[in-house]
Amino acid sequence: MNKIRKGDDIIVLTGRDKGKRGKIALRKDDSYVLVEGINVVKKHTKPNPLKGTVGGIVEKSMPIHQSNVAIFNVATGKADRVGIKLAADGKRVRVYKSSGEEIKVA
């Protein structure tokens, strides 16, 4: 079970985007995540008439390692760690380590 999933609200812990918040758009491989509006780079592209693309400078979000992000706890307003517990029905659920409450994905 992945502790960080698509749709989770996260906060960046290190790097030039430290302190910024966003939602996970995609889990890439096993250890990288793509976050909307975080780690944005400018990509210079050549025009390609065969593909119908116009050349220029395009802004693109790049993946960031999951060790550099933490799940954001809305109740406390801080970054939090994720734990896994067994629910009453026997299913594994993700919980915030600080409060013990279950993490709900919006």
Swiss-Prot record:
Coiled coil: none annotated. GO terms for molecular function: rRNA binding; structural constituent of ribosome. PROSITE patterns: RIBOSOMAL_L24. GO terms for biological process: translation. Keywords: Ribonucleoprotein, Ribosomal protein, RNA-binding, rRNA-binding. One of its GO terms (cellular component) is ribosome. Pfam families: ribosomal_L24. InterPro entries: Rib_uL2_dom2, Ribosomal_uL24, Ribosomal_uL24_CS, Ribosomal_uL24_KOW, Translation_prot_SH3-like_sf. It comes from the Bacteria. Belongs to the universal ribosomal protein uL24 family. One of two assembly initiator proteins, it binds directly to the 5'-end of the 23S rRNA, where it nucleates assembly of the 50S subunit. Part of the 50S ribosomal subunit. HAMAP family: Ribosomal_uL24_B. This is Large ribosomal subunit protein uL24. It comes from Albidiferax ferrireducens (strain ATCC BAA-621 / DSM 15236 / T118).
